[in-house]
Amino acid sequence: MIIATSLRSQTFCTWRAWRAVHSTAVRLESKLNEVPIDRTRNIGIIAHIDAGKTTTTERMLYYSGKTKRIGNVDEGDTVTDYLPSERQRGITIQSAAISIPWNNHKINIIDTPGHADFTFEVTRSLRVLDGAVTILDGVAGVEAQTEKVWKQATSLNIPKIAYVNKMDRPGAGFSRTVMEIIEKLQTRVVLCNVPYFENSKDNDPVFCGVADILHVKLLKWNPEIDPHGKNITVIDIEAERDTYPEVYETVVKSRESMVETLGEFDEAIIDSFLESNEDYMNIPINVLNEAIRKATLENYLTPVYCGSSFRNIGVQPLMDGVVKYLPSPLQISVPEITSSATKNVKIKHVKAKQAVKQDMEVTTKMNNRTGLVVNANPNLTLALAFKVMTHATRGVMTFFRVYSGKLVSNSIITNTTTGKKLHVKKLFMMHGDEPEEVKHISSGNIGVITGHEDDIQTGDTLVSHSHLKKGFSEMESNLKLLPIEIPPPLFNSAIEPQTAGDEAYMKECVRILTREDPSLKVSVDEEMGQTIISGMGELHLDIVKERLVRDMKAKVTLRDVAVSYKETLLNPGSSYKQTSESGSVSIEIEMDSFEGAAEESSFFEENGAMIIAEDNNIIIIEPSAISQNMLKALEERRWKSTYSLEDLQEIVIQGCLTALQMGGPIFGLSLHSTVIRVKSWDFPVADSSVASTVLLDVSRSAVTSYIATNRDWFGILEPIMETRVYIDSDIMGEVSHDLTQRCQAVIKSIEDESTQDVDALAWAKDEAEKTFLPPDYTMKAGKDAISYKNKKIIIAETPLREMIGYLSRLRSITQGRGTFDMTYIGMRRAIKSRFDAISKEFNFM
């Protein structure tokens, strides 16, 4: 922190004049969609809820000239938060994409939600980002959701910049927050600027600017004179060192720390230091910038900025940091691309092990002018669909990221997930919820396709060829980018139409919502005649209700939110054989179960095993299961059925899947972690008159009959969470008792907040010692006073049901000082006492 006692008249230049000297270009010289790939940045704004993501994004839009006025969350007039629920609640629910010009670059920004219920929105956004701006609340520091999203980004090797926001708030601590960045996020840092304060008439520090460490300049904003923050006073600190001695001293020490950190990574810094007569301040800025950029791209360190977005202070330097230090699409890790010569199972959410074994090698090369080239084919376009939304006037809009080639309007694309060919008439770039039509979307950019209501879904791979007559090779027509994983839903709510006449529109609205948000699931309780909608949390389903009733005007009733339970087979029974009335179609099955992830189960190692990903089930069609009649028909070429062997196998799978979703014998809940083994099956392929629906019915009936015959061997599964409760040590006993008694928690450990990993803590302390941090006015003795000795983390495994409403109880116990977060770890078989408690929810006892 830097404090000046008064504002004296100084020699200064304006921000515009200073940037004309220190930047390559101030204004974008060409159309936004024509910006070269090396000057394109795809970034996400990530953080904990209420850290200021949307507020910062709105300032970026304003300062870039994209908007004429600043949108504010509190006033409900933001560009990126455009849903009525977002504007009313003041939170981000859907990720929003927008492109802006800045300093002769194009920045594609995705503003993501911060609430844990909308984690899937963050997950799918991270898949198409090249860099991220992590925003931290300067008062709260590194919060739980920040850690989670940071780890997600790190696992994807995404370089990051940190921005300490809300420096105008009482209790904001820049250095304290940077210490937490080092310790909790486990990253080195370089301070690109530090906060500057002036004392008010009451002798209170007032945040009014930042000291730029690289350029040795003091940047001052005056919200009273210029509330929009466009005019910035730029003061040469070195020339005015006598007027600002503390500012100069802080900048010098910060520069020294920066050089020392960079010197451990880049020998060019050491060479430049020696050439500069070992003067830290004489190292050329371009050398420092290049070293910071290289270190950031390799995730060696994180550049740190600070500001107050709401007060319009510090956002422009952050935008400069984005274009200087975050990667272009030319500098990212090549995405995982596969191509299978065999067709995968067509049923949605089915993964077949045998298809994985036949993947073909896909070659990739980065072209410095056009970007990634796949299969040595510059005419090939490869893109990933990562989001679908419904626009008020444009209809269905699919967001996609182009990884190679160029997608042009009025072209033909192939969805390699489904094999469908689609005609793309128009392409768009997005401005919040407003589309802007363009002729093409080139490699490294994010665009939108309209139409194709049911033809493209989240996670689908799209390919196109600029020479239609040549078409695709077999490899290219089967190219697939790594799909986007969809987490299992944890909460349910029954939804009912108010009248029979409202049912059709209700179903259409639900279909739209689930198309936009794949983390929403819909099932039907046949016994109760109810539609069940499942989501990630209570807030998630509250938003669904608001959108249905208020936005879509659907006349529906949503019941109270309940936890999503499942049923499973506890003990395997004998095999069961089902035959059609004519006797020509038959199937024999066995059922079993397992615990844990299907991919890790020994059942998945067997030939013919396929995972039904949605409920962690496995279907095994044994290679020997096909009947002798079918084999002979193949060998003797007497196959008259219009269905191929592959088609018939998929019908068997679909029949089994339908039965699993129809539910178990206890409460009719869908089955989970269950194995269906097809021992034998027969279909009269020599007779073209037999319909495939007979095989579908027989397959379904075999499973439902098995369940009915062995109903006493089924049990309940409930979702279990790893819960971390962050509290002061003096109330640890009371909180622990509440967790074990009222929440049925099993406490795994109680740790000091700073000692979860001894090696990580030792590294963080060593790194902090080498990093200069200016003293915080909120702390008496600077960084030496920072201590987490009185903070504890209780780590426990808890049934999700018992954590509903826990936050209000925790706040009551801790007087508002406690927080917690939860992570889903899997389904667990309910013991007798838990089974009895769950039964009461279904009015069964």
From Swiss-Prot:
InterPro entries named in the record: EF-G-like_DII, EFG2, EFG_II, EFG_III, EFG_III/V, EFG_V, EFG_V-like, G_TR_CS
Binding site for GTP: 47-54, 111-115, 165-168
GO cellular component: mitochondrion
Protein's cellular compartments: Mitochondrion
GO biological process: mitochondrial genome maintenance; mitochondrial translation; regulation of mitochondrial membrane potential; ribosome disassembly
Extent of the transit peptide: 1-28
Record keywords, A-Z: GTP-binding, Mitochondrion, Nucleotide-binding, Protein biosynthesis, Transit peptide
Ranges where the tr-type G domain occurs: 38-330
SUPFAM superfamilies, per database record: EF-G C-terminal domain-like (SSF54980), P-loop containing nucleoside triphosphate hydrolases (SSF52540), Translation proteins (SSF50447)
Pfam families per UniProt: EF-G_D2, EFG_C, EFG_III, GTP_EFTU
GO molecular function, one term: GTPase activity
Function comment: Mitochondrial GTPase that mediates the disassembly of ribosomes from messenger RNA at the termination of mitochondrial protein biosynthesis. Not involved in the GTP-dependent ribosomal translocation step during translation elongation.
NCBIfam families: small_GTP (TIGR00231)
Family classification: Belongs to the TRAFAC class translation factor GTPase superfamily. Classic translation factor GTPase family. EF-G/EF-2 subfamily.
Name this protein carries in UniProt: Ribosome-releasing factor 2, mitochondrial
Species this protein is from: Scheffersomyces stipitis (strain ATCC 58785 / CBS 6054 / NBRC 10063 / NRRL Y-11545) (Yeast)
